[in-house]
Amino acid sequence: CGVIMVEQVNFRTRQYNYNTINSVKSAVNTSDVKNLSVTPTFTASVPITSKAPQVASLKMRTTLDSKEEKNEYTTILSQLDKNGRKIVDNLLKTGVLLNSDSNDHSTVLDNLYKIATEPRAEGLDSKTMLKDTIAAIAYPYIITQQFGDIPPEYQQQVVAANNENKTNLIDIWQGSQDVNVEHSGTCVAASTEFKLAKQLPAEFARFAQELSSPKLSVNKTIGLNNLADETLNAIWLLNAFEIPFETNNFNTAKLKFAPDKNAILRAQIQTTNKDPYERTPLDVLMQSTFMQIGSQQSYNSLTDKRAGKFNQNDKGLIEFEKTFTE
């Protein structure tokens, strides 16, 4: 399914898989929930929210109040063309640019400034990432799940990365075929990216900034009661989905999200060889991250395939995984 009309995405098409990351660091004893016979249910579905607990409602701001904000604004504009400057000006006038409804209360402006002035991950371009982030916030309907082709000059590198540690000749041959993705299974991930850009632009900009930085990851603090009705059930879910996290109490947890290890190569290719209607480097990183969350850290951006304990298919996410991701 496409994301061009993502608010009406048809999820009747089955989505699909999983793997693991590092063990989690938790102050909460999870032994009581290891052997639950029934998978715990999620808290009732609510609109995406980035707020840490007890964050007050935010006023809309349309004026640059401080010298720091004015400097950030001027710096961002200096890296954009005429059309880009017009879009940013409109984001300011509509209150989007100074929106601070993000997990760390940073504004869209703050994160765009970091993208423009701080180093990006290897092979990523700050101006491209800045332009793509602004465009997605201004008009989320441009977000797509359309994979790009692998240019000849990248083919050998991509196949080698996908066949890393494989010794069986059949597996190696199959691995060389799997990198030519024709039909994407990232519908849920693209839909989640869309909703984040549309509903929480400051959090979207924060994700874009952190995921494209050299650390290639983003932290997010959540209230455990937003994940499940019972704290131990929330911990069970985080462990079941292999989400790296830390807890200091029974109320909140700091989660770490990251794209899969091959996403950076896909993003590098899209930075230099993006064709019209294909995903941007930002789309690659965002969608890989959300696929990792839903597939228990088993997604591979080179093949658009996954493994996982909750589904035996190797594409997309099933409903349970979709609900957890969102």
Give a label for each model feature.
Residues 49-93:
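Basic/polar, acidic-poor N-terminal "presequence/leader" segments
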Residues 69, 83, 89-95, 99-101, ...:
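Active-site nucleophile-adjacent alpha helix/oxyanion-hole segment immediately C-terminal to the catalytic cysteine
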Residues 1-58:
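Non-Sec secretion/translocation targeting segments of pathogen effectors
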